[in-house]
Regions:
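N-terminal domain-onset segments
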Residues: 1-46
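Generic preference for hydrophobic/aromatic residues in regular secondary structure cores
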Residues: 20-30, 65-67, 76-80
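General structural signal for secondary-structure boundaries
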Residues: 21-22, 57, 94
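Amphipathic, interaction-prone secondary-structure segments
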Residues: 29-73
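A short, surface-exposed interaction/processing loop segment used at functional sites
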Residues: 71-102
Length: 102
């Protein structure tokens, strides 16, 4: 899967939102990033990890939540960054369901 394909999935979902500058309190024109594959540690089993596509960073300083896309399950999920490492904290399904779960 490519970054462009993932962006297409997100853009299709965002058609349902009347104002992408204020979706659940976030300006998505500022918080969405070019999908980037990154290493995520399993928050329950800190010995295992997988590579997932980061698509949104809640804060510019990377201290908040992130939203990722899992190309194997075709689902979006939440992660957090601590000590310069990303941790997967769960899949929520669609991009918007994940965003509303933050």
């Amino acid at each position: 899967m490519t970054a462009e394909e993932i962006q297409g999935i997100i853009n299709e979902e965002l058609k349902a939102e009347p104002d992408i500058e204020n979706v659940f309190g976030l300006d998505l024109t500022q918080r969405l990033i070019v999908p980037t594959k990154q290493k995520y540690w399993d928050s329950a089993d800190k010995k295992s990890f997988e590579y997932l596509w980061t698509v949104l960073e809640e804060t510019p300083d990377k201290n908040g939540y992130v939203i990722y896309f899992d190309e194997e399950t075709k689902m979006f999920g939440l992660g957090v960054q601590t000590n310069d490492e990303l941790f997967d904290i769960g899949n929520y399904g669609t991009f918007l369901k994940t965003l509303y779960s933050m």
